[in-house]
């Protein structure tokens, strides 16, 4: 029996009212709650039940091409934060709206299903009132495969364009090619401009994709592992150290170091980098649940005291700061000691509940960027008052930022910090993301929703998305 949209919504809503919203749904004739376990983002191959997959796919069939508002996606983000798993691949369609491209598992919570089905009911109701305006409704035709329907709606409206010329790209394909401009009649923040931005950045990402033993990227030496992820590599020209996946990044006038979460074997080198840099702030965006997951191999290096080779580290928590939307920043002080070297104190900002491959809101991002900037400025002033030689060295006193891979959450924060700097008022979003990608790797600003946050921040400043 194929449930209609209204029947499916009614059954799901009833179960949510019975406080089963966090359970995954299952479907055999009627909808039921799987109360035996919590949502784990499983596929059939990793242990999801067939009835869970049937439920998830049935919901998906009703929400293909449905426009999700910012309020809808905020509700889905609440679920992502709660379970520390992002189950949804979303794509922006402009004006803060998104569509669901696909699920990342064969499970779906009943609460999330309710959010999606209510969005479908809203659009269906609106379509009835505008039958003659079918061009505004892209509802999924019965019998059309879900992915085919989604793909037809999401195809880019403009062909990919080559990356723009910029001084740092002489070693990359596409350098020196002519720049394309957006038509003057296009809204600077509308769907056409966003699609053009996405197209240009996708082209650059593909150009920068690493080949086997690619000379553009740092290669492991001496048998030691260098990269957490095979496809997320470290630009050789801007590498901080030969044994770390870490890069000097300069976006406009904003200088930082972006790196991956250090491997256990890299901790001594990582601490040495922090000390030599006279790091004014270390921003760790990897969540506490990621660090606790032993499968990820992420040593809890900044919240605990310890000895790493010749380096001794003492950690002390100082305060906790709310950033909004329930996102919290824990503040620590790391004291790094090594025989024959100056003792270095590094402030740490740890955001412990920002899940991987997601975006926090523009408001939270602004608050985090301001906190990191203010912390760094206080420390820089201390070094300046002591007459430190690091003040005159452009390679030092840089905030060090990492999440897990050092490309998604990390790049979202760096982009916001760049926009906080009044010296960068002429930079477009295309400029900022392109500079990050060229200087580290093509995956910087990993997810569409992370780019959407930077776009929203830019729009609030009247900053262009594209270069003219």
Curated annotation (Swiss-Prot):
Entry annotation: catalytic residues: 403 (phosphocysteine intermediate)
GO molecular function terms noted in the UniProt entry: protein tyrosine phosphatase activity
Domain Tyrosine-protein phosphatase stretches: 152-461
Enzyme class: hydrolase
InterPro entries, A to Z: Prot-tyrosine_phosphatase-like, Protein-Tyr_Phosphatase, ProtTyrPase_YopH_N, ProtTyrPase_YopH_N_sf, PTP_cat, Tyr_Pase_AS, Tyr_Pase_cat, Tyr_Pase_dom
Cited Pfam families: Y_phosphatase, YopH_N
Catalyzed reaction equations: O-phospho-L-tyrosyl-[protein] + H2O = L-tyrosyl-[protein] + phosphate
PANTHER family: RECEPTOR-TYPE TYROSINE-PROTEIN PHOSPHATASE (PTHR19134), TYROSINE-PROTEIN PHOSPHATASE 1 (PTHR19134:SF449)
Record's protein name: Tyrosine-protein phosphatase YopH
Organism: Yersinia enterocolitica
Gene field: yopH
């Amino acid at each position: 029996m194929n449930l209609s949209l209204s029947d499916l919504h009614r059954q799901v809503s009833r179960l949510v009212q019975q406080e089963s919203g966090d359970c995954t749904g299952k479907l055999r004739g009627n909808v039921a709650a799987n109360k035996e376990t919590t949502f784990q983002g499983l596929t059939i191959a990793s242990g999801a039940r067939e009835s869970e997959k049937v439920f998830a796919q049935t919901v998906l069939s009703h929400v293909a091409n449905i426009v999700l508002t910012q309020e809808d996606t905020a509700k889905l983000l609440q679920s992502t934060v709660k379970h520390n798993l992002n189950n949804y691949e979303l794509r922006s369609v402009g004006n803060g709206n998104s569509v669901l491209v696909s699920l990342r598992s064969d499970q779906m919570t009943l609460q999330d299903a309710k959010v999606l089905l209510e969005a479908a009911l809203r659009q269906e109701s609106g379509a009835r009132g505008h039958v003659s305006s079918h061009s505004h409704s892209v509802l999924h035709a019965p019998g059309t495969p879900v992915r085919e329907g989604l793909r037809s709606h999401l195809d880019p409206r403009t062909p990919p364009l080559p990356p723009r010329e910029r001084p740092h790209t002489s070693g990359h394909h596409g350098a020196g090619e002519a720049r394309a401009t957006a038509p003057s009649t296009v809204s600077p923040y509308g769907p056409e401009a966003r699609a053009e931005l996405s197209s240009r950045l996708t082209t650059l990402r593909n150009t920068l994709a690493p080949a086997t033993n690619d000379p553009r990227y740092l290669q492991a030496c001496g048998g030691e592992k260098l990269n957490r992820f095979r496809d997320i590599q470290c630009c050789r020209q801007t590498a901080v150290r030969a044994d770390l996946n870490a890069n000097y990044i300069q976006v406009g006038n904003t200088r930082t170091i972006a790196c991956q979460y250090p491997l256990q074997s890299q901790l001594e080198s990582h601490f040495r980098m922090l000390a030599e840099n006279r790091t004014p702030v270390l921003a760790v965006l990897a969540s506490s649940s990621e660090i606790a997951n032993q499968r990820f191999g992420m040593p809890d290096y900044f919240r605990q005291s310890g000895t790493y080779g010749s380096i001794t580290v003492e950690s002390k928590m100082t305060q906790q700061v709310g950033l909004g939307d329930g996102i919290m920043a824990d503040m620590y002080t790391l004291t790094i000691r090594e025989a024959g070297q100056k003792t270095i104190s590094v402030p740490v900002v740890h955001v412990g509940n920002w899940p991987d491959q997601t975006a926090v809101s523009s408001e939270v991002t602004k608050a985090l960027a301001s906190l990191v900037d203010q912390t760094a400025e206080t420390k820089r002033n201390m070094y300046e008052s002591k007459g430190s030689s690091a003040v005159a060295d452009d390679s030092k006193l840089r905030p060090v930022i990492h999440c897990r891979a050092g490309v998604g959450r990390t790049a979202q924060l760096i982009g916001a910090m760049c926009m906080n700097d009044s010296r960068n008022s002429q930079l477009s979003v295309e400029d900022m993301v392109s500079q990050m990608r060229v200087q580290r790797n093509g995956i910087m600003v990993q997810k569409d929703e992370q780019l959407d946050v930077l776009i929203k921040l830019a729009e609030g400043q009247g900053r262009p998305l594209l270069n003219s």
